[in-house]
């Protein structure tokens, strides 16, 4: 998922001196919570979760490779990059590419591994969300200057990552149901949820690059919409799996 960057300005005081450390600690705490959630799944459902957790992380990495292969040739050309950002269609492009690549990055391993339970899909989603959080937090650990931020920016970052992991888990339950029941419309539903989650972030990034008004409005929309989509995806996925049983068969 796209990251909304609310960490632009370095203020004086304790946040100036310790901001990157605090944010790194909060990011680490978030990863610990994800790990505890995985342990909770493991304690209830045995070792069946671990391959899916690892597959989720691997699928996310492969999705980033695919995204880079498609977008870097355009971004590497300054003229093309400037034209893309200035276009009103930039948010759509910035949302469509992650939605397609990352949801296929969940669906393909779920289909290949023959997912049979919602908890397996949840584990895969947690793996994808956790590795994404690691990649976004890594620059803070390697380059403290890159992590300087305001206290509000730190809280927004942790809020966003928490709900992004939750959304990954929710979308994975839809992908898993689509893979298990051979009902592709739920894969499309997961892609649609991912697209809607990234669309405001793309518009936010565009307005920041253009120094145009409306930045705060789109930031607020992004931070509200992601939790709503995460809760909706989790509820829908749970309902689908519960209605069909633990291992729904292919549609006739």
Regions found by a protein language model. Give the residues of each.
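Hydrophobic alpha-helical segments at protein termini of multi-pass membrane proteins
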Residues: 2-252
């Amino acid at each position: 998922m796209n990251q909304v960057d609310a960490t632009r300005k370095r203020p004086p005081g304790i946040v100036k001196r310790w901001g990157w450390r605090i944010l790194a600690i909060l990011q680490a705490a978030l990863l610990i919570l994800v790990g505890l959630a995985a342990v909770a799944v493991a304690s209830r459902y045995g070792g069946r979760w671990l391959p899916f957790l690892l597959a989720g992380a691997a699928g996310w990495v492969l999705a980033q490779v695919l995204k880079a292969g498609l977008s870097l040739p355009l971004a590497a050309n300054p003229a093309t990059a400037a034209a893309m950002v200035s276009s009103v269609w930039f948010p759509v492009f910035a949302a469509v590419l992650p939605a397609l690549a990352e949801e296929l990055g969940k669906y393909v391993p779920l289909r290949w591994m023959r997912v049979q339970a919602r908890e397996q899909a949840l584990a895969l989603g947690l793996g994808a969300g956790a590795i994404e959080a690691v990649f976004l937090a890594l620059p803070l650990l390697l380059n403290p200057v890159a992590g300087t931020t305001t206290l509000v920016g730190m809280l927004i970052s942790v809020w966003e990552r928490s709900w992004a992991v939750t959304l990954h888990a929710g979308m994975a339950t839809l992908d898993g149901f689509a893979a298990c029941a051979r009902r592709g419309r739920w894969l499309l539903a997961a892609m649609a949820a991912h697209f809607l989650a990234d669309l405001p972030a793309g518009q936010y990034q565009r307005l920041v690059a253009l120094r145009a008004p409306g930045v705060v409005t789109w930031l607020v929309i992004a931070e509200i919409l992601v939790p709503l989509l995460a809760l909706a995806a989790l509820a829908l996925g749970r309902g689908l799996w519960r209605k069909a049983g633990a291992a729904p068969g292919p549609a006739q």
